[in-house]
Amino acid sequence: MTFTEQLAAAWQRNDSLLCVGLDPDPQKLPLSLTGAGGAIFSFCREIVDATADLVCAFKPQIAYFHSQRAEDQLEQLIHYIHDAHPGIPVILDAKRGDIGSTAEHYALEAFERYHADAVTVSPYMGFDSMQPYLAYPDRGVIVLCRTSNPGGSDVQFLQVDGKPLYQLVAEAARERWNTTGQMGLVVGATFPNEIARVRQIVGDMPLLIPGIGAQGGDIEATVKAGRTADGTGMMINSSRAILYASREKDFAAAARNVALQTRETINRYRHG
């Protein structure tokens, strides 16, 4: 199955638009795992097992693994998700952006080393920086468009021919870049008006939406702005609020409770 097919199936099977971000901060891991060998993998595995029936995707953030020299644990984690929970796509949050052979090697890293189902990329260097990823026809390429951080406005709201830059990115994705149907866009939950504008531009293209939970994005506004006609179309990401619901031995159960509550809140507004 392609990434988009897996995602659509997971939306239906788990009745969920929730994506759980896997951002394992060693300073916040449960006390029972502190200092243990393979702690990052063990922590993420427990979170995955506790939430896999509640999500449409998992999104490991590559920097949290690389900074701890835990690339092997990231490989192990993605393999584990595919083996233990088949059909749940894994988005490698790498935000890569380069050209030529460097981009080719970043694509190799994402799709042949880590075997991710999709990867996040930056469009700043243009379409040729994305082409190596699109050469993998069964994988997804999720392009930064309107990010959830306040500083994103410094660039993304620059006016070009009377339009903010983020809108031009969305238009380029719709009109020129997404010819193979592999592409999605990142649009932050902290900016629901922009979510609505991007949805208007790109039709049913999947949107990865960070910014709920710890970043304070409003779920109702996010869902109503970004849902497609069938009540899907989004991967609404929550990381810290779920991962660090508890540092005690009940951390996985606590994470599940927060994930369940988040999914239920999202679903309350999907068809309303």
UniProtKB/Swiss-Prot annotation:
Signal peptide: none annotated. Belongs to the OMP decarboxylase family. Type 2 subfamily. This is Orotidine 5'-phosphate decarboxylase. The lineage of its organism: Bacteria, Pseudomonadati, Pseudomonadota, Betaproteobacteria, Burkholderiales. The active site is at 95 (proton donor). PROSITE patterns: OMPDECASE. Its EC number is 4.1.1.23. CDD domains: OMP_decarboxylase_like.
